[in-house]
Amino acid sequence: MVEIFATGRSLVDLYGSDGSEAKKEMNHPVMPKRVGYLYDKMLDKDLIRFVILESARHKHARHEVRKVLAHLERYVEQTYKILADGSYVPTRPKLKTIYDDSSQKQRELKIVPFWPDGIVHRLIVEVMKPVLMRGMHPYSCASIPGRGGARIRKYLAHAMSCDPKGTRYACEMDIRHFYPSVPIRRLIRTIGRKIKDKRFLRLIWAILKSCGQGLAIGYYICQWLANFYLEKLDWMLARMPGVKYYTRYMDNITMLGPNKRMLHRARVAAEKFLRDELGLAVKENWQVYRTAVARKAKGRPRAVSAVGFRFWHGFTTLRRRNFLRMLRQARRIQKKQKMGIPVSVQQAAGFLSRAGQLNHCNSFRVKEKYIRSIKIKRLKEVIRNESKRQCKAGWALYGRTPPATA
């Protein structure tokens, strides 16, 4: 007996006599459920107020931020109005060139006003964050709350210590000129696979077009979209045969596995996917190397270098460049403390930050030789006094007095 559905189609008509239609549907990629009404979520005055206060954290020294906070409710109303009637027009960014000490490169920042552009960017991310995080790879890190370099450091250190056979080989890759090379049209189409709110997508399109070619370094929204754009690449590489451990810190990709040939295949697949699907390219300085050397073989093993550390089988050390910078800072502070010259807040904070990295690697001898002779309590006292001074100045800015402490 042939069972008939309410539509009038039988089981044979629906699936085919040999089940070919069912197989076809199973193999076809299913469109993910898309989210709508995100623009309407932005039209919430409580959310706008929260975003303004969050965006102003650690920026009270800026005149434009103090102006917005002094008339908070007025700016909440104005933000709501320009979004509700669609009168918001993205501001053309100002260009600023800085020298990035960590990467030893000159970078071009694009800066927009705190209001309205900075607030609108943050509002977009706030309502879009659950959508972007939904399919993100667990070890896709950088510029995401709770996903910094420490997450990758723990993962790689554990892998190198506990699985020497599965980490015999490593592959390191870097995307060439990542931010300025992202094609905006492809990015918007990729976002459209998860978001169906056309008004919301038009707003993102207008912001991205205003920043010129590619994504802008300095836009809060761009760092989220950059991670989202590489989501497909992350899952493709993480699932490839021979790739046992996979991490990505913004545009720096690290893969570990037991077989060198399989890692080369993953590298070639990544280059093809980036070129054909994402419109990007891999730098020529990619590396595939062995992290362990057999006892009878000549040569030394190489360490995996990522997020400021070098990961060996069984222990972790600081990168040479980071170690030398910490050493120079330590000698300057030692000299000042011996001569009785006060250490500046910037020097104290910078040294304590770099010295804190030693707590996350094997550094007993380094601490004994370079850190023990420095009076750490004095440096913490300098930072504490500056923090109290800034706190009192912040209360005085609004004509109030700080609460009494016990």
What are these regions (language model features)?
Residues 1-77, 81, 398, 402-406:
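Non-catalytic, polymerase-adjacent accessory regions of viral genome-replication enzymes
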Residues 3-5, 11-14, 19-22, 118, ...:
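Right-hand nucleic-acid polymerase module
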Residues 82-105, 119, 196-210:
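Reverse-transcriptase-like RNA-dependent polymerase core
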Residues 142-152, 254-256, 287-297:
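Beta-rich nucleic-acid/ligand-interaction surfaces
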Residues 154-250, 254-269, 289-290, 303:
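Conserved polymerase palm-domain catalytic core
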Residues 195, 271-280:
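A common structural junction motif
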